[in-house]
Amino acid sequence: MFSAETIAGYLNGSVEGEPSTVVTGVARIEQGKPGTLCFFANPKYEKYVYTTKASIILLNRDYELRESIAPTIIRVDNAYEGIASVLGLFEQKKLANKKGCDRFVWLPWRFKKGKNCYIGAYTYIARGARLGNSVKVYPQVYIGENVTVGDNTIIYPGVKIYQGCVIGANCIIHANAVIGSDGFGFAPQANGEYKKIPQIGNVVIEDNVEIGAGTTIDRSTIGSTLVCSGVKLDNLVQIAHNVEIGKNTVIAAQTGIAGSSKVGESCIFAGQVGVIGHLKIGNRVTIASKSGVSKNIPDGMAMLGFPGMEASKYKRSFAVFRNLPALRDDVDSLVKKVAVLENNQEDKSQ
Amino acid sequence: MFSAETIAGYLNGSVEGEPSTVVTGVARIEQGKPGTLCFFANPKYEKYVYTTKASIILLNRDYELRESIAPTIIRVDNAYEGIASVLGLFEQKKLANKKGCDRFVWLPWRFKKGKNCYIGAYTYIARGARLGNSVKVYPQVYIGENVTVGDNTIIYPGVKIYQGCVIGANCIIHANAVIGSDGFGFAPQANGEYKKIPQIGNVVIEDNVEIGAGTTIDRSTIGSTLVCSGVKLDNLVQIAHNVEIGKNTVIAAQTGIAGSSKVGESCIFAGQVGVIGHLKIGNRVTIASKSGVSKNIPDGMAMLGFPGMEASKYKRSFAVFRNLPALRDDVDSLVKKVAVLENNQEDKSQ
Amino acid sequence: MFSAETIAGYLNGSVEGEPSTVVTGVARIEQGKPGTLCFFANPKYEKYVYTTKASIILLNRDYELRESIAPTIIRVDNAYEGIASVLGLFEQKKLANKKGCDRFVWLPWRFKKGKNCYIGAYTYIARGARLGNSVKVYPQVYIGENVTVGDNTIIYPGVKIYQGCVIGANCIIHANAVIGSDGFGFAPQANGEYKKIPQIGNVVIEDNVEIGAGTTIDRSTIGSTLVCSGVKLDNLVQIAHNVEIGKNTVIAAQTGIAGSSKVGESCIFAGQVGVIGHLKIGNRVTIASKSGVSKNIPDGMAMLGFPGMEASKYKRSFAVFRNLPALRDDVDSLVKKVAVLENNQEDKSQ
């Protein structure tokens, strides 16, 4: 439960109305009930500003009310951004309360962990693993030998982290993600079989990284697969062995980066993108969804298509593709006309 | 074990031969052994009708035997559909028997569950969660705070359901699926970092939904990500935050629906389809495998390609694409011929 | 810990220097420390041959040293392949040591397992399941009724194997893979709903198969989904019901094979490939990443594109696609020129 005053303080906002009004949750403006907080940002919803039953409403500082309203008002620079922070307030409060160790937890001999950790039931932590302060490990997680996890990191149920991997501070790893599974490396043999190339590197996840549900990150053959600080990976993403993902790069769901490719900083990859192995992708590269990248990409380029091309060029080519049958018809008709013209010229030259 | 009579009753069929013949399982017609039931639907297998060792055979009502056969016969309108029901008989019998609570189950204080539930070992059920009647929860499942699960729903091993999600009745959720993980929402900051936008909505799965292994469904930012009744999702499908999937829509493996898109009723999406965010897909839309959808689609349209186009139009364009080098050659040759023609005309006009 | 002599014996190599030199691990040549072994294969790193602090160095037999070096040398035909084997030595030693049964393991009545098995905590093994010799089952694994697992197979944390599946010998199954989930089969009903077609077959994995993290393999409707010996599947691969994958075929991450398709032997599929259902793919077929296969493919063909075509043909078409706007311009200009030519001819014929 938070008061208007507390929330306004948190948001650097100002209260109009009763500062002691309290709320226990957030609602959409059109569904606001007493005890909830709502916000107004999208003009389409303006009418609800005057009818909402919410107890507190977030308004932009420059919004002029046409008449007085019932809820306590908190004025902020940007109500839309403000609501995110309010949600964070509630969420963090709830999570921060979870600490201690459930029954049925497998801990190693001489286990090293920081203060205020939570470890859920049926979680297995192998020998040599270490947790920082305020780490939350949900139930049914596997943390292999010598894994280290930084402060404040949250590991959701069913995550599996193989031996020797390093997880930074302030990370969030969603359910059933797998970190440190063997890279996909095999040496073809003369008889057609493949011999496994042992993968004895690890995965290093730096700070402030979020990893989506079901995402898989393979360990390096030797050395480290590296996910730099601030990277955000969506669900079901595949990061192969020896890959490096630069700082603050964002990768949407079901994208795959093949072995040994290096992705720069501050890139944005949409969903279902594929990057083949051994490439170098620059900084601030944008790749449209479903695109396939098979060549190095310089800094700042926007890519689209399969095979991927510079986005604007691909769009121009695709615009013609849409009408290819008409182009074919034009050419067929030209062929006929030119034959007639050639015939006529020949007739005349005879 | 079921008798021919029981099975015929179940299928609305009629028995020819001994009604008390019993079977304990189903076999392919070419592999039928005593004590099994087989069916004949594909003409390619007709010879086996006369040689199978199965004890019971399902035949279409209109199939005329060329000679008498050993197995007891059950005549039905459609043997192929009939076999599905018979399989169901056996399967349901087996599953329905599972009830009770294994040891090593984590249950909350004052846990509310219906009759005839099964809860497997190492499953964690958080406070406030409720199960309906005859719910089967396999081992190693995580059910978060305040989750509700409707009657007869089956949750296979390793499924993780985050707090506050709602699962309907008669649903099946396959192993390692994740429901309610955070939506992929971040606000870019001036310094290049991204700030997490808390995702405090939930996921609502209505009745009769099947969800494949490893599929991920993210919770909404505010409100609900919604999967309507009768929807069938295959394996490794990604449903992003705020998405809605309409009634009886079927989505094949590895397809991804990006944030806030609304998919209509009775659509059929093949595998590896991608739908970008904030779109509206109509009812009864069909999308071919691997297609990318980047625009709204009206009711009933068939889509194909990347970027996606109306299927028939895409096919015509692609037919020309297949022979683009020939088209290029035709044009090159025309360019030369026209140059010659122009030259000749000029010569003559001089 | 291994001596130079032991390692040389294992690699069929010869020692130059002290055969009793021992190492406890492997390092990159530029990071070699005493007690480690390094290798030299990439000419870019040649200078480190003369400066590395590693205790043992693997060199190609034909490499000529320019001056004497400190480490003990092991000469082999191919240092790069050699290092893989050395890594294997260390890895296998570590793993082979793991045996016995953790506490909190769910074992069935009259459980049958071979010698030297390891079973991790929170693993559930259902009735009728059997493990061969030296099987390693990590924590939090689910092994359903009557599943059999062959000798030396390693099953990583969180793997779920449904009832009745058969896993061969010397297999490796990575974390959170799912084997034997229901095939995606539904019969449309007159009212728009879908009725589940029970999937009562199983999955058969032969020997020497590796299965990546998060990969899903569905059970057959009737009969078996079959993964033949020597097959290697990367992460997040989807194998649908009734599929067969031939011997020694390698399939990279996020590829999906739809229902009932048969893939031949010794094929190589890159990442994010899609194969639609009911196809027959020959032996030794190569499919480039992201390609979509919608037709049968004969032995030995290389495929590329979406829809997939013979790779060389696709590349030629795509080369024209890149410059389609220029082609369109050429045609437009031809149309004009031909109109002028026609006009002129007409003028003259008048």
Locate each region found by the language model.
Chain A
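Terminal amphipathic alpha-helical/low-complexity segments used for targeting or macromolecular assembly
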Residues: 1-103, 170, 176-177, 182-196, ...
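Structural signal for interior beta-strand "rungs" in well-ordered beta-sheet cores
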Residues: 39, 100-310
